[in-house]
C-alpha cells in the first residue's frame, strides 16, 4: 500500500526514462506488490477471477525484463513487523466482513435474478410486444425521423440472413467442385440436393449442363469401335434430356413460388386454377407475365331433371367442389348408387386436370368439340346415369371431407361406393340380358362375433359404460330408405377383388366387407322409427346394411358369406327447414377375431380403477360445426344391440362407445363362439386371418391411443381457457419500472460482489513457492527478506549492490532508498525515474519528513489522520517546523490545547491553516514513536554477496506453462523467442547518453507544482530550511577564518565579486556568457556564485594551511548548496547584491561589442586620411 498520496506529492520530481536506457543495470524488484496486484486486479472481460493469475503476471513481466536485458533481483516478503501485523489484523477483519457481505450479496443477486425471470415470463404471457418506455412516449419526433420498420424486418437479422446465404453458397461451391473433379459423384436425385433452394439447384444444373456439353470427352472417352458411336451419342442425348427435365422442374418450382400466392388467394375465394405460370418478359427487365390455366369460377349448376349428366358435362359438375349444401344437384330420380370407385374417380380427375401440365392449352372450341364427341360415346353406355350422380356426390363430399373426414375415411368410402355402383350396374345389365356370371371367393371366418351399433347425437347422461372403446372409420350412405341384401353385398366384395386382380394389385379386403359362414349369421332386423326434427337443426343420417334372414337366396345357401358393415360414419350435412326427417335405426354384426380381442385386453388397463378412469367419451376429432363420433360396443350376452339415430342437441354430433362387458365375459364369449365353428372352417388355413386381425388390432389400438392423446390435449386447452389470467389487472408500466429497477440492482450487486471478492483475496505461501519455481526456470536470482521486502530493496540500493528498485510502493523511500523506477509495467504510462536528491532539493523532504507524512497520511504501520491529504500534511509541517518528531509533537500539543480551549475565543493571530486544523480528530498516543523506529531501523539482511544469472530453460518452462496455463509448445515459444533472441545478442557499442548526463533536459522535464497551497507550503519550508542552515554555514566559515587568522582577506573576494563586469570567463558561445549564466536565472547564478566561492575558498585555505577542522563538516557544506539554490529559485525576495550582480552581468556584454565598433570607426578614419 505505502504512504497514501505520497506519489502524487513526488510526481513533480520524476522524469521519464526509456526502458532501453536500463539495459545492463541490476535492479531489485519487490515481487510482493506484484502478487497483490495480480490477485486483486487481474480479471477477465466479465470481471471474474483468472486461474493462476499471479503466475501469468510473473511470466509476462519476467519476459519484459529479460527482453530489455535488465538483470533483476526479486525480493520476497518475510515475516511482518508487529505494527504491520496489527494493521493486517484489522484488514483481515474487514476481509472477513467483506466475505460475509459477499455471500449475502450473492443471495440477493439470486433473488433479483429470479424476480426478473418471473417478470419476463409474465411479459410473455400477457403480451407479445415490449411495453413502450416513458422516454419514447414523452419524446416528440423530429420531422426527419424515419418511419418504423415493418415487424418482419424488425425481427429479421441481416447477419443471420447473410450467414444462411453464405452457407448456401459454400454448399453450392462444394457441389460444383465435386462435380468438376468427378462428374459422376453428384446425385441430383438425393435428398441433400433436393433440400437446396431452387435458385441454387437451377444454377448447379445449368453449370452441369454446360460442363457436360463442352467437356464430355474429358471424363468419358470416345468409343474405340465405330459401331459403338451411336450408343455413345444416345447416352449423351439421354443425359442431356435428363438434365433438361430437372431444369424444367426447378423452373416450375421457382415459378410456383412466385405465383403460389395468386393461386392460394383465388382458391380461398372459391375458384379453381389448373395452373399458374409466371415468367419474365425478355424485352423488359422489370416486367413479368402471369399465365393462368383452367380458371373456373364458383357457380351454381342447375341440372335439368329430364336430361341425364354425361361425360361431356364433367367439368360443369366439378364446379360444385366448393359449393354449399344448398347448391347441390337435385336430380329427378334419387340415385340408388354410392360414389364411384377409386379408378373411376382418378379417371375423372385426370380428365379435369389434363394429362400433363406441359401441354399447351387448347382452345375452348376444340375442347368443347372433344367433349361432345366423348359425350356421345359416354352416352352409349360407358358411364351410367347412376355413375354420373355418384360422381356428383363424390365431388360434393370433398367439401365435407375437410370437416370430418380423413384420408382413411375417403379410401373406405370410395371402396364401398365403387362396390355399390358396380352392383347396380350389374343388375341393369342382367335385366337387359347382358349379365355375366362371376364367382366369389370364400372369406376366412372370424372367431368372435361382436355386434356393432352406431348412434348419432349425444347421450343423455354423457357417460360411457365401455372399458374397451375404440373408433374406426365410417362410411356415409346418402340413401336412407335403401335396403341392401346380403347377396348384393357378396357381389360387391367379389367384384372389388376381381378389379384388384385385373389391375395387378393384391386384393386388399376392406374393413367394410368381412364375412362369416351363413351358419353363424345372426340376422338383425332393422326397425325404422321416424324421428321428429325441429326446424333449422342439423340432422345426421346413418345408413346401416340390413341383413334379411328371409332372403330366399340366403336361405338356399346360394351365397355362403354374410357382409359385415365394419364402420359407418356420420357426415351428412343436409339441413332441413321443417317437417319430419325419418332416420333409420340400423344394426349390423361385426366379427372380431379372438387374437385381436386378447391383444386389446392386454393393451387396456388391468386394474379396476384404471378401467373406471378409462371409461370416458372419446372425441374423434374437433370440427367447427357438426362433429361425428363413433361407438363400437362389444356384444352383450342377451343379444344384439340396436342402433338409433337421434337428433343432436349440441353443436356437434358424436358417437359414444358403450359396453358393460368385462374381460371375463369377453373370454367366455370368445370360447363359446369358438365352439360353434364347423370342422370345415377349422381345417382352413389361418395365416391370412392372423395377419389381418393383428394388423387390424394394431390399427385399432393406435387409433385409440391417438384419440386419448387428442382428448388429453383438448382437456388441457379447456382448462387453460377456463383458468383466470393472474396478470390481467397488472399495469405494464409498473412492470417496466420494476424490471428496470431490478436490472440496475442486479448490475450494482455484481459490481459489489466483485469488489468484495477483491478485498477478501490474500496472498498465500503456495503462491510464493510457485513463483520461486518459475524464477528458477528463468535463471533469475531471488532472496527472502527477513521482514519487509521494501526495506531489503532499499538496503541493496544503499550498499550499491543494485542500481535502483522497480516498485510502485512508496514505503521504500521511508526505508532510505535513493533510486526508484515506477510504472515499468504499465502500458498506459511511461516509465518514471525518481531520485532522492531531486525531491530533496525541490520539495525539501528528507527521510524524517517522509516519516512524518506517513503519520499524517497513513501507511502500513499507522492508520493516519482522517480527512488529511498530502497538501494538508505539507501545511502542517510548514506550520510546525522542527527535526525528527518535533513537528508532530508540537502539532499534537497545540491541538490538545485548542480542544481544551474551544469555549475560549480563538487566537486572532492563528492562520487559516490552524483554524482548519482545529476540526481534525487525533487518535490517542499520536504520534507513536514505534512507527518511526520501524522505518529508521528495519530488520534487513546486510550481507554482501554476488548474484548470478542463468539462461532460461525452455523445455522446463514449456512444461510449466502447460501445467499451469494450459498452453501448448507453440504458444510458449511465441513468448520466449523474442526474449531469447535479445539475450543472445552480443552488443558492445554504448549509447550516447551513457557518456554524460543531460542536466538541461532533466530540468526542462521537471514538472511544476500545480497546487497553489502546496507551492506556498513548499516555498516556506525551503526558506525556513535555508534560514536554519545559514548560521551553521557562517559558523563553519568563521572557524576556518579564525584558524587562518585572515578574516579581512576572506572578505576581499566578496568585494571583488561585486565588480563582476571586469571578470571574463572562457565561453564557447561566441561572446555570450558561460553555461551556468545562460541556463540559470540571475538569482540562481548569484546564489551559486556566492555560496560556491565561499566553499571553494574554504577548501583552498584548509588544504593550504592544513587546519585542524574536521573534514566531516565539509561534506555538510557541500550538501547545503542545493537547498540554498532551490531557495533562491522559490523565494520571491533576494538581496540587493544579487540584483547588482544580475545588472552587471548584462552590462558586461555591451562594452565587448562597443569596443569592436570603436575599432572599426578608427580604422575607417585612418583609411580616409590616407
UniProtKB/Swiss-Prot annotation:
Start and end residues of each stretch annotated as I-domain: 785-880
Locations listed in the record: Nucleus; Chromosome
Residues reported to bind Mg(2+) 1: 30, 77, 788, 790
Span(s) of short sequence motif Nuclear localization signal 1: 1049-1065
Modification N6-acetyllysine occurs at: 8
Subunit structure: Monomer. Homodimer. Component of the homologous recombination repair (HR) complex composed of ERCC5/XPG, BRCA2, PALB2, DSS1 and RAD51. Within the complex, interacts with BRCA2 and PALB2. Interacts with RNA polymerase II. Interacts (via C-terminus) with ERCC6/CSB; the interaction stimulates ERCC6/CSB binding to the DNA repair bubble and ERCC6/CSB ATPase activity. May form a complex composed of RNA polymerase II, ERCC6/CSB and ERCC5/XPG which associates with the DNA repair bubble during transcription-coupled nucleotide excision repair.
Ranges where the record places region Disordered: 304-479, 520-587, 600-701, 1033-1146
Lineage: Eukaryota, Metazoa, Chordata, Craniata, Vertebrata
Enzyme class: hydrolase
Entry protein name: DNA excision repair protein ERCC-5
Keyword terms of this UniProt record: Acetylation, Chromosome, DNA damage, DNA repair, DNA-binding, Endonuclease, Hydrolase, Magnesium, Metal-binding, Nuclease, Nucleus, Phosphoprotein
Cofactor-binding details, from the entry: Binds 2 magnesium ions per subunit. They probably participate in the reaction catalyzed by the enzyme. May bind an additional third magnesium ion after substrate binding.
Gene name tied to this protein: Ercc5
Amino acid at each position: 500500500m505505502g504512504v497514501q498520496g505520497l506519489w502524487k506529492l513526488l510526481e513533480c520530481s520524476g522524469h521519464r526514462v526509456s526502458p532501453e536506457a536500463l539495459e545492463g543495470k541490476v535492479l531489485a524488484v519487490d515481487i510482493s506488490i506484484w502478487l497483490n496486484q495480480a490477485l486483486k486486479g487481474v480479471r477477465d472481460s466479465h470481471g471474474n477471477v483468472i486461474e493462476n493469475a499471479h503466475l501469468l503476471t510473473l511470466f509476462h513481466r519476467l519476459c519484459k525484463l529479460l527482453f530489455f536485458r535488465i538483470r533483476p533481483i526479486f525480493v520476497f516478503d518475510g515475516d511482518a513487523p508487529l505494527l504491520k501485523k496489527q494493521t493486517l489484523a484489522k484488514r483481515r477483519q474487514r476481509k472477513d466482513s467483506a466475505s460475509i457481505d459477499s455471500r449475502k450479496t450473492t443471495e440477493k443477486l439470486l433473488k433479483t435474478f429470479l424476480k426478473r425471470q418471473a417478470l419476463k415470463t409474465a411479459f410473455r404471457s400477457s403480451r407479445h410486444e415490449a411495453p413502450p418506455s416513458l422516454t419514447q412516449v414523452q419524446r416528440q419526433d423530429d420531422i426527419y425521423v424515419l418511419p418504423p420498420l415493418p415487424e418482419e424486418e424488425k425481427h429479421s437479422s441481416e447477419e443471420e440472413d447473410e450467414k444462411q446465404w453464405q452457407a448456401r453458397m459454400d454448399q453450392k461451391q462444394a457441389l460444383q467442385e465435386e462435380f468438376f473433379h468427378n462428374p459422376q459423384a453428384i446425385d441430383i436425385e438425393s435428398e441433400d440436393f433436393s433440400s437446396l433452394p431452387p435458385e441454387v439447384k437451377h444454377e448447379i444444373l445449368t453449370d452441369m449442363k454446360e460442363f457436360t456439353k463442352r467437356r464430355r470427352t474429358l471424363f468419358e472417352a470416345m468409343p474405340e469401335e465405330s459401331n459403338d458411336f451411336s450408343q455413345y451419342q444416345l447416352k449423351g442425348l439421354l443425359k442431356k434430356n435428363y438434365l433438361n427435365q430437372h431444369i424444367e422442374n426447378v423452373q416450375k418450382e421457382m415459378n410456383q413460388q412466385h405465383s403460389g400466392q395468386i393461386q392460394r388467394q383465388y382458391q380461398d375465394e372459391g375458384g379453381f386454377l389448373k395452373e399458374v405460370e409466371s415468367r419474365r418478359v425478355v424485352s423488359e427487365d422489370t416486367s413479368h407475365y402471369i399465365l393462368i390455366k383452367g380458371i373456373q369460377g364458383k357457380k351454381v349448376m342447375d341440372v335439368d331433371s329430364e336430361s341425364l349428366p354425361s361425360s361431356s358435362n364433367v367439368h360443369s359438375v366439378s364446379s360444385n367442389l366448393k359449393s354449399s349444401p344448398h347448391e347441390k344437384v337435385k336430380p329427378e330420380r334419387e340415385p340408388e348408387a354410392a360414389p364411384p370407385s377409386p379408378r373411376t374417380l382418378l379417371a375423372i380427375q385426370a380428365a379435369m386436370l389434363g394429362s400433363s401440365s406441359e401441354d399447351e392449352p387448347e382452345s375452348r372450341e376444340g375442347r368443347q368439340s372433344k367433349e361432345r364427341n366423348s359425350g356421345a360415346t359416354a352416352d352409349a353406355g360407358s358411364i351410367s346415369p347412376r355413375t354420373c350422380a355418384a360422381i356428383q356426390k363424390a365431388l360434393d363430399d370433398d367439401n365435407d371431407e375437410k370437416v370430418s373426414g380423413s384420408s382413411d375415411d375417403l379410401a373406405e368410402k370410395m371402396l364401398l361406393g365403387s362396390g355399390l355402383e358396380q352392383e347396380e350396374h350389374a343388375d341393369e345389365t342382367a335385366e337387359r340380358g347382358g349379365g355375366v356370371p362371376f364367382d366369389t371367393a370364400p372369406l376366412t371366418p372370424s372367431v368372435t362375433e361382436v355386434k356393432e351399433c352406431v348412434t348419432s347425437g349425444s347421450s343423455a347422461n354423457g357417460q360411457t359404460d365401455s372399458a374397451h372403446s375404440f373408433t374406426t372409420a365410417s362410411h356415409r350412405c346418402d340413401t336412407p330408405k335403401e335396403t341392401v341384401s346380403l347377396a348384393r353385398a357378396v357381389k360387391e366384395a367379389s367384384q372389388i377383388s376381381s378389379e384388384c386382380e385385373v389391375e395387378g394389385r393384391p386384393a386388399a379386403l376392406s374393413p367394410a366387407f368381412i364375412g362369416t359362414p351363413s351358419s353363424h349369421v345372426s340376422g338383425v332386423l332393422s326397425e325404422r322409427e321416424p324421428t321428429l326434427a325441429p326446424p333449422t337443426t342439423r340432422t345426421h343420417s346413418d345408413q346401416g346394411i340390413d341383413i334379411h334372414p328371409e332372403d330366399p337366396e340366403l336361405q338356399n345357401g346360394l351365397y355362403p358369406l354374410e357382409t359385415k358393415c365394419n364402420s359407418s360414419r356420420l357426415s351428412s350435412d343436409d339441413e332441413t327447414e321443417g317437417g319430419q326427417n325419418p332416420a333409420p335405426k340400423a344394426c349390423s354384426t361385426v366379427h372380431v377375431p379372438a387374437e385381436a380381442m386378447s391383444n386389446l385386453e392386454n393393451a387396456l388397463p388391468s386394474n379396476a380403477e384404471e378401467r373406471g378412469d378409462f371409461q370416458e367419451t372419446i372425441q374423434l376429432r374437433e370440427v367447427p360445426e357438426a362433429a361425428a363420433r363413433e361407438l363400437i360396443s362389444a356384444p352383450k350376452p342377451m343379444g344384439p344391440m340396436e342402433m338409433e339415430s337421434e337428433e343432436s342437441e349440441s353443436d356437434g354430433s358424436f358417437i359414444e362407445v358403450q359396453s358393460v362387458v368385462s374381460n371375463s365375459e369377453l373370454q367366455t364369449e370368445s370360447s363359446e363362439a369358438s365352439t360353434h365353428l364347423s370342422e370345415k372352417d377349422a381345417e382352413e388355413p389361418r395365416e391370412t386371418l392372423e395377419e389381418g386381425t393383428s394388423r387390424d388390432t394394431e390399427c385399432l389400438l393406435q387409433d385409440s391411443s391417438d384419440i386419448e392423446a387428442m382428448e388429453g390435449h383438448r382437456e388441457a386447452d379447456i382448462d387453460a381457457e377456463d383458468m383466470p389470467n393472474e396478470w390481467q389487472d397488472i399495469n405494464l408500466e409498473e412492470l417496466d419500472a420494476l424490471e428496470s429497477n431490478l436490472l440496475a440492482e442486479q448490475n450494482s450487486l455484481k459490481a459489489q460482489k466483485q469488489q468484495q471478492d477483491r478485498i477478501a483475496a490474500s496472498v498465500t505461501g503456495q503462491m510464493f513457492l510457485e513463483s520461486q519455481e518459475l524464477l528458477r526456470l528463468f535463471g533469475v536470482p531471488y532472496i527472502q527478506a527477513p521482514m519487509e521486502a521494501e526495506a531489503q530493496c532499499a538496503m541493496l540500493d544503499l550498499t550499491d549492490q543494485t542500481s535502483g528498485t522497480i516498485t510502485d510502493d512508496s514505503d521504500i523511500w521511508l526505508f532510505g532508498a535513493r533510486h526508484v523506477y515506477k510504472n515499468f509495467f504499465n502500458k498506459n504510462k511511461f516509465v518514471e525515474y525518481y531520485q532522492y536528491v531531486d525531491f530533496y532539493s525541490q520539495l525539501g523532504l528528507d527521510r524524517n519528513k517522509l516519516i512524518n507524512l506517513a503519520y499524517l497520511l497513513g501507511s502500513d504501520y499507522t492508520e493516519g489522520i482522517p480527512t488529511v491529504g498530502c497538501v494538508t500534511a505539507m501545511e502542517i509541517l510548514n506550520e510546525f517546523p522542527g527535526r525528527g518528531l518535533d513537528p508532530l509533537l508540537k502539532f499534537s500539543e497545540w491541538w490538545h490545547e485548542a480542544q481544551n480551549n474551544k469555549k475560549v475565543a480563538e487566537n486572532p493571530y492563528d492562520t487559516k491553516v490552524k483554524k482548519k486544523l482545529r476540526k481534525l480528530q487525533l487518535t490517542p498516543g499520536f504520534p507513536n514513536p514505534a512507527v518511526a523506529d520501524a522505518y529508521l531501523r528495519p530488520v534487513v539482511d546486510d550481507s554482501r554477496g554476488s548474484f548470478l544469472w542463468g539462461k532460461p530453460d525452455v523445455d522446463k518452462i514449456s512444461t510449466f506453462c502447460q501445467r499451469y496455463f494450459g498452453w501448448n509448445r507453440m504458444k510458449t515459444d511465441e513468448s520466449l523467442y523474442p526474449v531469447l533472441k535479445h539475450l543472445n545478442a552480443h552488443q558492445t557499442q554504448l549509447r550516447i547518453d551513457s557518456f554524460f548526463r543531460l542536466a538541461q533536459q532533466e530540468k526542462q522535464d521537471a514538472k511544476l507544482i500545480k497546487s497553489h497551497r502546496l507551492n506556498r507550503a513548499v516555498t516556506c519550508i525551503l526558506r525556513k530550511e535555508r534560514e536554519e542552515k545559514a548560521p551553521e554555514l557562517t559558523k563553519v566559515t568563521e572557524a576556518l577564518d579564525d584558524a587562518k587568522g585572515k578574516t579581512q582577506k576572506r572578505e576581499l573576494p566578496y568585494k571583488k565579486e561585486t565588480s563582476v563586469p571586469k571578470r571574463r570567463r572562457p565561453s564557447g558561445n561566441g561572446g555570450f556568457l558561460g553555461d551556468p549564466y545562460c541556463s540559470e536565472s540571475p538569482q540562481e547564478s548569484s546564489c551559486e556564485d556566492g555560496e560556491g566561492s565561499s566553499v571553494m575558498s574554504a577548501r583552498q585555505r584548509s588544504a593550504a594551511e592544513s587546519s585542524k577542522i574536521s573534514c566531516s563538516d565539509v561534506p555538510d557544506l557541500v550538501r547545503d548548496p542545493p537547498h540554498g539554490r532551490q531557495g533562491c529559485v522559490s523565494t520571491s525576495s533576494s538581496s540587493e547584491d544579487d540584483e547588482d550582480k544580475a545588472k552587471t552581468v548584462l552590462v558586461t556584454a555591451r562594452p565587448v561589442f562597443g569596443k569592436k565598433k570603436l575599432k572599426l570607426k578608427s580604422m575607417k578614419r585612418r583609411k580616409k586620411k590616407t
